Every structure is written in structure tokens, then in C-alpha cells.
């Protein structure tokens, strides 16, 4: 089968035509891939950064955001049928630890990821345990379903705390941050402010309903950044700090600024992964009585039900997809992702 694989311990990703079709077991399904989306994780693997060097076995078929069709299944599978349109949870869990048995599978200590630790979705076929498969409702397109993984991250982050009527600060306007703008607006947030240094994506955030999308690139230090943020808050009629913070950047200066402008009793969901250690004002956390929640992946499968229900109720995520390419143009897709001048990039695996 055709697949995209990390074949060498250097930057790049390569197309192969002779990858074996994976074998499925008693409780597995075989999925024919129709659409995949390029994730920031895939870009890290492409660039072969320090995280990738320490994490990714080579060779490895990568990718974990997908939509496809079930074409075969093991004898033990009763939850899906051949012909079903599906996406799937890319975190594979043990099912036996305390968290798994308590229904908190997203907190499994033994989690492994498709396209990271085991064969991924950038291939014509993917094998996945049936318990990880999620049926796509007829009203949702394959393109949108292929973005369920990052959309689920955004849902989990944004809906960890009640957004309705609240003032929300989002740091980081990558695709997940942009999705969070859509979610916060759909759920009735009062004011939504988002920060980033990428003007293309900040304009997308404005189009998605952000009250203010602030380009923080011009500010030379933390004091200037906080001063400008307080001006923004005043300009839009805020008399207190932000109620909810959604941290999507993993950038120390963004996190420090967020802590500075949160209201007393504010709540923060932290999704952004830092490349190094983070230094924060511990006193601000204590004396403001802030609540911080780390976010990893999606709640299985409450997050999935929430996002499909919200899409069916009218939340429009189609504008997050800015580029659609055939799989033979995958190099162009990765170049677009590296440029940052995009939302989600979809790869079509049809013949």
C-alpha cells in the first residue's frame, strides 16, 4: 500500500508504495483511509526536532488525524460494520489501569499514539482497535471528521470550565486555538481575546468571532505586553480580569501574561506544550486563587459526542480548513504548514 513514512533520522518525510497492508486482530477493524489532516505533531516529526529524535522510532508511518471507511473487521467486533464511515481516537490505552477502569481513559499511564509509537494514518489502510473507532454521522463530511482529533483537543480545553457569559483569553492562534474561538463563541462567551504573532491566523480568529485578536510580536518585553493587554481590556469595557484562560502556545511569556491579567478566582486550561522549563509567578496563582488544569488529548468519548453534537447544532468548523490537496502533493502540504499561512491542511487519499 501507499504510505508516508519517516524513513531517515533527518528532516523530511517520504512516500513509499510497498508498505504491507496491516493485519487486523480479533477486536480490530481495518480502515481504508479517505482523508487525513496534517497536525503540528506531524510537522515536528517532519522537521526532526529534539522531541522527535527522542520519541519516534524509524522507520515509522506517521499521521493520526483521519477519516475513512471500515473494510474488514475481526470476529469479536460488533460495534461497527463494514461500510461504516469512521474516524478514531489516536491514543491507544491499556484498559486495565485504575484510570481506564474508572472511565478516565485519557489519563492512562500507558498511552501510546498512532503515528508516533505505532503505525499511523498516513497510509491507504489503518488497523485500530474497535473500541477506539468513532462512527461519523451522515451530516458531517469526511474533511471535517479528519480534524476531529485537534477539534477534540479544543473542545476538551475550552469546555473544561463554563464559558457562558465569561471573558475568555486564548494564547496561541494555531488551528486548535482558532477552533477554541469558534467553540467559545458558539457556547456564549462574552468577550474573546486571542494573542499570537501570526497575522494570517489572527485574521482568521477575527473572522471566527474573536472580540480582539492581538499581534504580540511588536512588544519587546513582558511589561510592554501586559500594558498593551490591559489597554485592550479597557478598550473593550473590561473592568476586571479574564474569567477563563485557554493556553495553547506553550510560550513562557504568554503564560506569564495570562497569569497577570486573570481575574481572582479565574480558571486556566493548559494545552500548549513547552520546549523547555516554564517560569511563572507562583504568588499570582496562590493569591488570585487560580485553578489550573492540564489538558492531554480528548476525554474518551465524551469529547467526541460533544463535538459531533455541537457540529450538528450548527457550529461551523468548515472555515478552519484552508487547503485541500491530493496525497501526491503532500510535500506542498507540509510546506504550507511550515509557512504558518494556513488553517488545517487536508490530504485526499482517493485514487
Curated annotation (Swiss-Prot):
UniProt keyword Chloroplast present: no
Cofactor, how bound (note): Binds 2 Zn(2+) ions per subunit.
Pfam family, one: ADH_zinc_N
Assigned GO CC terms: cytoplasm
Catalytic reaction annotation: L-threonine + NAD(+) = (2S)-2-amino-3-oxobutanoate + NADH + H(+)
Subcellular location, principal: cytoplasm
Localization terms from the record: Cytoplasm
The entry's keywords: Cytoplasm, Metal-binding, NAD, Oxidoreductase, Zinc
Marked site: Important for catalytic activity for the proton relay mechanism but does not participate directly in the coordination of zinc atom: 149
GO molecular function, one term: L-threonine 3-dehydrogenase activity
Top-rank lineage group of the source organism: Bacteria
Binding site for Zn(2+) 2: 94, 97, 100, 108
Positions of NAD(+) binding: 176, 196, 201, 271-273, 295-296
InterPro entries linked: ADH-like_C (IPR013149), ADH-like_N (IPR013154), ADH_Zn_CS (IPR002328), GroES-like_sf (IPR011032), L-Threonine_3-DHase (IPR004627), NAD(P)-bd_dom_sf (IPR036291), Zn_alcohol_dh (IPR050129)
Record-annotated active site: 41 (charge relay system), 44 (charge relay system)
Classification via PROSITE patterns: ADH_ZINC (PS00059)
EC number: 1.1.1.103
Family: Belongs to the zinc-containing alcohol dehydrogenase family.
Described purpose of this protein according to its UniProt entry: Catalyzes the NAD(+)-dependent oxidation of L-threonine to 2-amino-3-ketobutyrate.
Protein name stated in the entry: L-threonine 3-dehydrogenase
Amino acid at each position: 500500500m501507499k504510505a508516508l513514512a519517516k524513513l531517515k533520522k533527518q528532516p523530511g518525510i517520504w512516500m513509499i508504495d510497498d508498505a504491507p497492508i496491516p493485519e487486523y486482530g480479533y477486536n480490530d477493524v481495518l480502515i481504508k483511509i479517505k482523508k487525513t489532516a496534517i497536525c503540528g505533531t506531524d510537522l515536528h516529526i517532519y522537521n526532526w526536532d529534539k522531541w522527535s529524535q527522542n520519541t519516534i522510532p524509524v522507520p515509522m508511518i506517521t499521521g493520526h488525524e483521519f477519516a475513512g471507511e471500515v473494510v474488514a473487521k475481526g470476529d469479536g467486533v460488533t460495534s461497527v460494520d463494514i461500510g461504516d464511515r469512521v474516524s478514531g481516537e489516536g491514543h491507544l490505552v491499556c484498559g486495565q489501569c485504575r484510570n481506564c477502569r474508572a472511565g478516565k481513559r485519557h489519563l492512562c499511564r500507558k498511552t501510546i499514539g498512532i503515528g508516533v509509537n505505532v503505525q499511523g494514518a498516513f497510509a491507504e489502510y489503518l488497523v485500530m482497535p474497535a473500541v477506539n473507532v468513532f462512527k461519523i454521522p451522515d451530516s458531517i463530511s469526511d474533511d471535517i471528521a479528519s480534524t476531529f482529533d485537534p477539534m477534540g483537543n479544543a473542545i476538551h480545553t475550552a469546555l473544561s470550565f463554563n464559558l457562558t457569559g465569561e471573558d475568555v483569553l486564548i494564547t496561541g492562534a494555531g488551528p486548535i486555538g482558532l477552533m477554541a474561538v469558534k467553540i467559545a463563541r458558539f457556547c456564549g462567551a462574552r468577550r474573546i481575546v486571542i494573542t499570537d504573532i501570526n497575522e494570517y491566523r489572527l485574521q482568521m480568529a477575527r473572522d471566527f468571532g474573536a472580540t480582539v485578536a492581538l499581534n504580540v510580536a511588536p512588544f519587546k518585553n513582558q511589561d510592554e505586553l501586559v500594558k498593551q493587554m490591559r489597554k485592550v481590556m479597557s478598550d473593550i469595557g473590561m473592568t476586571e480580569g479574564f474569567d477563563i484562560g485557554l493556553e495553547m502556545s506553550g510560550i513562557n511569556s504568554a503564560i506569564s501574561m495570562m497569569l497577570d491579567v486573570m481575574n481572582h478566582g479565574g480558571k486556566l486550561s493548559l494545552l500548549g506544550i513547552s520546549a523547555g522549563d516554564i517560569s511563572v509567578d507562583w504568588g499570582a496563582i496562590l493569591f488570585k486563587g487560580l485553578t489550573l488544569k492540564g489538558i492531554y488529548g480528548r476525554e474518551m468519548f465524551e469529547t467526541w459526542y460533544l463535538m459531533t453534537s455541537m457540529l450538528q447544532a450548527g457550529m461551523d468548523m468548515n472555515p478552519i480548513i484552508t487547503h485541500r490537496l491530493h496525497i501526491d502533493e503532500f510535500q506542498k502540504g507540509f510546506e504550507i504548514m511550515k509557512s504558518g499561512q494556513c488553517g488545517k491542511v487536508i490530504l485526499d487519499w482517493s485514487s
